[in-house]
């Protein structure tokens, strides 16, 4: 009964956190999608940690589905990659995708083990 409320509250805070991280990163790295990289890598670690922590179902809804669902972004990653490809920034897009996927999986694994 409370599940949608937990997801909505977590989603609100996740969206706000993503906005703040993205604005901060854009000022520091205007030519590279640092904000998206940060939220996706941090989100991978935190979701792994949550999964390993044995958290209650309500916490998983609030933090995992709500906060992390709004904080991380799959579609922006893809669109930024397409933009780099359109600009023929091949090295940059390879580094971006490799860092996102390889480091993301490793950080999820690490977070899971830290959470245990």
From Swiss-Prot:
Q: Has keyword Coiled coil? A: no
Name the family: Belongs to the fluoride channel Fluc/FEX (TC 1.A.43) family.
Ligand binding (Na(+)): 69, 72
Q: Which PANTHER family match?
A: FLUORIDE EXPORT PROTEIN 1-RELATED, FLUORIDE-SPECIFIC ION CHANNEL FLUC 2
Biological processes per GO annotation: cellular detoxification of fluoride
* NCBIfam families in UniProt: crcB, PRK14205.1
Which ranges does the record mark as transmembrane? 1-21, 32-52, 54-74, 93-113
What Pfam families does the record point to? Answer: CRCB
Q: Does the keyword Ion transport apply?
A: yes
- Source organism per entry reads Geobacillus kaustophilus (strain HTA426)
Catalytic activity as recorded in UniProt: fluoride(in) = fluoride(out)
Record localization: Cell membrane
Annotated control of activity: Na(+) is not transported, but it plays an essential structural role and its presence is essential for fluoride channel function.
The cross-references to InterPro entries, in alphabetical order and at most eight, read:
FluC (IPR003691)
Q: What is this protein called?
A: Fluoride-specific ion channel FluC 1
Q: Which domain of life is it from?
A: Bacteria
User: What GO molecular function terms would the record report?
Assistant: fluoride channel activity; metal ion binding
Q: Which of UniProt's keywords are assigned here?
A: Cell membrane, Ion channel, Ion transport, Membrane, Metal-binding, Sodium, Transmembrane, Transmembrane helix, Transport
Q: Name one GO cellular component term.
A: plasma membrane
Q: What is its main location?
A: membrane
Bilayer topology annotation: Multi-pass membrane protein
């Amino acid at each position: 009964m409370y599940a949608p409320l937990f997801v909505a509250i977590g989603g609100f805070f996740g969206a706000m956190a993503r906005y703040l991280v993205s604005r901060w990163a854009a000022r520091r790295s205007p030519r590279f999608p640092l904000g998206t990289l940060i939220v996706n890598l941090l989100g991978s670690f935190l979701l792994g940690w949550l999964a390993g922590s044995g958290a209650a179902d309500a916490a998983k809804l609030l933090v995992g589905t709500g906060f992390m669902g709004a904080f991380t972004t799959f579609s922006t990653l893809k669109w930024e990659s397409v933009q780099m490809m359109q600009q023929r920034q091949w090295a940059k897009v390879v580094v971006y995708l490799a860092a996102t996927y390889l480091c993301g999986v490793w950080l999820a694994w690490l977070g899971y083990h830290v959470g245990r």
